[in-house]
Amino acid sequence: MRTRITALITGLVLSTAIGLSAQSLPPGKTVTDNGPRTYRFTVEYTNANTKGDIFRRQRLTGDYTRGLPAGDVTWKNVVQQDADGATAPFGAAQKRDFMEGFRYHNDLAATLKPEFFKAFPPAAVFERNLVWDTGMIEDFGQGHFDRLKLNVPLHAGSSDDVTMPGVGVFHNRDIVLEWIGSSQRNGQDCALIQFQAFLNPVEIVNAGITLKGLSNYWGQIWVSTATKQIEYATINETVVGDLKLAGQDTTMTINVIRSGVLEPVTVK
């Protein structure tokens, strides 16, 4: 009888331990970089008026490699394609030579320093976004990994003004991260992390163009529980605001919809 009771208690303890383990992610893990790993980042911009009429589309694609010596990352093969209207095919790819081999230490805070993009043309906002978005995705997926609990929202930042040198100011009202479940990508068991931030004031002043409006952004990140590597990520954003072009006195209300996918080209 005593043996049966002991076995029952042991079973309950193990069951409880397994249940608690399932509610939190592995603590104290660092990102495992077994050499360079390249990702393809594709982002599409759709520009529309208040009636939903699409008048311009842009697509940016670039190869981002992390895991280089000294914690460096680099960009190659960054191109932009443009199209008018909702259905016209994208035009020829325009190479962004100033980003070919662009290498820096993987530090998101450093990318917000005024001198960081000194080799970029002043109007290269989309290209700057590639750098900021990858840094943000890695920060959300890896930097807050230990703090996440299953189905428990984590408020990672609020009332935070981000000064984007040469571009403008973005105010994060409330960044919410949430570990919403488990999945698989590239043969890896992954934590699926959702991020969102709504009603964020944004003001852009760049190359004679001004835009004042509100941004809503959200997405999902698949993070390997074994290596803490990003295995897949999405980002979506809408910006509605008043746009004033250089040399014009009137403004127009514009709706910019942005969608992006970050996925590994080389699987670890």
Identify the function of each model-found stretch.
Residues 1-5:
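Positively charged n-region of N-terminal signal peptides that target proteins for export
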Residues 9-19:
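Bacterial N-terminal signal peptides
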